[in-house]
From Swiss-Prot:
The chain crosses the membrane at residues 1-21, 27-47, 48-68, 87-107, 139-159. It catalyses: a ubiquinone + NADH + 5 H(+)(in) = a ubiquinol + NAD(+) + 4 H(+)(out). The keyword Transmembrane applies. This is NADH-ubiquinone oxidoreductase chain 6. It comes from Alca torda. PANTHER family: NADH UBIQUINONE OXIDOREDUCTASE SUBUNIT ND6, NADH-UBIQUINONE OXIDOREDUCTASE CHAIN 6.
Length: 173
């Protein structure tokens, strides 16, 4: 289990590295998907399954809108790949900042805490995941509807902008 958590943490950091170097929006979205899958997998392995699923669905919806908008604005005929020297320099700088942060923050001291799952306290522990489910269905349903409507509206606006000036409501005057 420890190796699996370490693997998910490494995938999360590598996804952040892929987004931070961001040679092109085509490759940046791969880093976003990798980071979101690793983060939600980490929550899932800790026992927070419903919140992990909701975060994954909302985050993928947001990433879809950002990806469509970025690709529409950056139509490069020759996009940079991750093997270019500038992108490798960004990656080395990101890893350097990460190493300095671990040295200053005391990386070795973090191993003393360990990983605690949701149900590790005992039989009568309250799972925060199912408490969150009750809040989603009672008080949070209106907010989820507003957030879903906003994502759908943003997607249609971006698709209208991508379509061009020839047809649609947005025209050159």
């Amino acid at each position: 289990m420890t190796y699996f958590m370490f693997f998910l943490g490494l995938c999360f950091v590598l996804g952040g590295l892929a987004v931070a170097s961001n040679p092109s929006p085509y490759y940046g979205v791969v880093g976003l998907v990798l980071a979101s899958v690793a983060g939600c997998g980490w929550l899932l392995s800790l026992g927070i399954s419903f919140v992990s699923l909701v975060l994954f669905m909302v985050y993928l919806g947001g990433m879809l809108v950002v990806f469509v908008y970025s690709v529409s604005l950056a139509a490069d005929p020759f996009p940079e790949a991750w093997g270019d020297w500038r992108v490798i320099g960004y990656g080395a700088g990101f890893v350097g900042v990460l190493m300095v942060g671990m040295v200053i923050g005391g990386f070795v001291e973090c191993w003393d805490f360990g990983v605690v799952t949701v149900d590790s306290v005992g039989m009568f522990s309250v799972r925060l995941d199912f408490g969150g489910v009750a809040m989603f269905y009672s008080c949070g349903v209106g907010m989820f509807l507003v957030a879903g409507w906003g994502l759908l509206l943003t997607l249609f606006v971006v698709l209208e902008l991508v379509r061009g000036l020839t047809r649609g409501a947005i025209r050159a005057v």
